[in-house]
A protein has these predicted regions:
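ATP/Mg2+ or Mg2+-diphosphate-binding catalytic cores
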Residues: 294-330
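ATP-binding glycine-rich phosphate-binding loop
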Residues: 19-41
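Active-site acidic catalytic loop and adjacent metal/ATP-binding pocket
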Residues: 33-51, 86, 196-242
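A conserved alpha-helical element in kinase catalytic cores
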Residues: 54-103, 122, 126-132
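A cross-family kinase active-site recognition segment
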Residues: 90, 121-183, 209
Length: 330
């Protein structure tokens, strides 16, 4: 996946005009992933006025983006959670269609800036405490989508097995990871088959499947005191609830602290929603599936800032997880 940074910087500058901010603000790139994300800073005060997200053409339809905005509004109005509110442009719309210098139309949205910092994965005591709040936060999201009559009208992608690590993977093919060996691929193919069989047996019900955030990793959480704020709903879609637990463990799945984090997450989740023995039995399935999904993401996002650092030792950690998974369920 290639990003033309000069092009995206020009689109970001143009996007500010749609909000009437071109004179007082400037956009500075902070993250490259599925989208380009910019901090919108006031030129005089240096304050953060918002966060601009520029989508790659074709990644989301306008209908999908409007559905995301609808869900954010529901979360803010009907749950105790804090999420970043989208801001309307001069035309009264949340989504701005900005024409780039290449002639393509880029969907842009600015959300409010939320204070806070991402969890520090090196502070284990705090991590365990925060995962308890994260479990509770996740359960509020799941409960809201279960009772919201508008959920069925939401137009969002489905994070099915095929769309995650199967025949039509949205983030790319895990087999294309640069350090993948023929031996590792053969072993992981067996693991993928086990995952598919277990998911078919687990099934999709109103209690285990629905509208989810789908990318509740540490980078998309902000901590301020004991309050967890959730950002970046760009990948929200329909999936298994356990995918939100697995995504919270993104890039740290092989660390020794994971069992403590899972237990903390469960203790928070169960305060709001029930969690069955059947759900518990599939936690490892979803963690393994997420790990393979991230393997695909790392392979297909070589331009993203943190990829080089994250890729160090990735295959070793992945194979350790896979071998354990196969011992348990193979």
């Amino acid at each position: 996946m290639n990003f033309d940074m000069d092009l995206f910087n020009q689109v970001a500058k143009s996007a500010l005009e749609y909000y009437g901010w071109q004179d007082k603000d400037e956009a500075k790139l902070i993250v490259l992933s599925e989208n380009a994300t910019y901090m919108v800073k006031n030129k005089e005060t240096g304050n953060n006025d918002g966060v601009l997200r520029i989508g790659r053409p074709g990644y989301h339809t306008l209908s999908e983006l409007n559905s995301e905005m609808k869900w954010l509004k529901q979360i803010n109005e009907y749950t105790p959670l804090i999420v970043a509110n989208p801001m309307k442009g001069l035309n009264g719309e949340y989504i701005q269609n900005v024409k780039g210098p290449d002639g393509e139309v880029y969907n842009c949205v600015i959300t409010e800036f939320l204070k806070g910092s991402s969890p520090d994965e090196n502070d284990e005591e705090q991590m365990v405490k925060q995962f308890k709040y994260l479990g509770e936060t996740t359960a509020y999201l799941h409960r809201q989508t279960e009772i919201w009559n508008g959920t069925s009208k939401i137009d969002r992608f489905e994070w099915s097995f095929d769309n995650v690590i199967g025949k039509t993977p949205k983030w790319g093919d895990w087999r294309s990871f640069p350090d993948m060996t023929p031996e590792a691929q053969t072993f992981l193919e067996d693991v993928v088959q086990i995952i598919e069989k277990r998911l078919k047996r687990y099934g999709k019900t109103g209690n285990n499947f629905g509208l989810i955030h789908a990318d509740l990793r540490l980078a998309n959480l902000l901590i301020e005191g004991e309050q967890i704020k959730v950002i970046d709903f760009d990948d929200c879609g329909f999936g298994w609830h356990l995918q939100d637990l697995a995504s919270a463990l993104s890039f740290i799945e092989s660390k020794p602290i994971v069992p403590k984090l899972v237990n903390a997450w469960l203790s928070g989740y169960k305060k709001i929603l029930p969690f069955t023995d059947t759900d518990f039995e599939e936690i490892d399935t979803f963690i393994m599936m997420r790990r393979l999904q991230l393997t695909a993401w790392l392979g297909s996002h070589q331009q993203s800032g943190p990829v080089a650092e994250l890729s160090v030792g990735w295959m070793e950690g992945t194979m350790d997880l896979a071998e354990r998974f196969k011992r348990l369920f193979g």
